[in-house]
Curated annotation (Swiss-Prot):
Keywords for this protein: Cell inner membrane, Cell membrane, Ion channel, Ion transport, Membrane, Metal-binding, Sodium, Transmembrane, Transmembrane helix, Transport
GO MF annotations, alphabetized: fluoride channel activity; metal ion binding
Species name: Azotobacter vinelandii (strain DJ / ATCC BAA-1303)
Name the record gives this protein: Fluoride-specific ion channel FluC
One GO cellular component term: plasma membrane
Function: Fluoride-specific ion channel. Important for reducing fluoride concentration in the cell, thus reducing its toxicity.
Annotated binding of Na(+), by residue: 76, 79
Coiled-coil regions listed in the entry: none
Key word Membrane present: yes
Family: Belongs to the fluoride channel Fluc/FEX (TC 1.A.43) family.
Compartments where found: Cell inner membrane
């Protein structure tokens, strides 16, 4: 378990560093489009999690430390949007469309409301 934990920690650090570098680069080149960094890492993270998930389904022998390090660690550090997208896709694939769309709506609206609430808390 130590190996898996270490893989997640290292992957997370690398994902965070890539997100930070992406944000800095985009801010330096297109400061008026600050949101582009988040959009870029979210879309890239979704592409990568879909690819990795597919590869890991085809290759169940891939060690847990590598799977966890890449998905929970690297992509978790880069973006949590990729995990959210995969969860939604898996619900749809398993025939649970109503739950998938409820999860989608609650996640987006809940995230927006929680972000707003956090902002409001700073003003108290």
């Amino acid at each position: 378990m130590i190996g898996v934990t270490l893989a997640v920690a290292v992957g997370g650090a690398l994902g965070c560093l890539l997100r930070f570098a992406t944000s800095n680069w985009i801010s330096a080149h297109w400061p008026q489009h600050f949101y582009a960094a988040t959009l870029a890492v979210n879309i890239a993270g979704c592409l990568l999690i879909g690819y990795l998930y597919g590869q890991f389904l085809l290759r169940p022998e891939v060690p847990l430390a590598l799977r966890a390090g890449l998905i929970a660690g690297f992509l978790g550090g880069l973006t949590t949007f990729s995990s959210f997208s995969l969860d939604t896709l898996r619900l749809l694939e398993s025939g649970q469309a109503p739950l998938a769309f409820s999860y989608l709506a609650f996640s987006v609206l809940g995230g927006l409301l929680a972000t707003w609430a956090g902002l409001i808390l700073t003003k108290l």
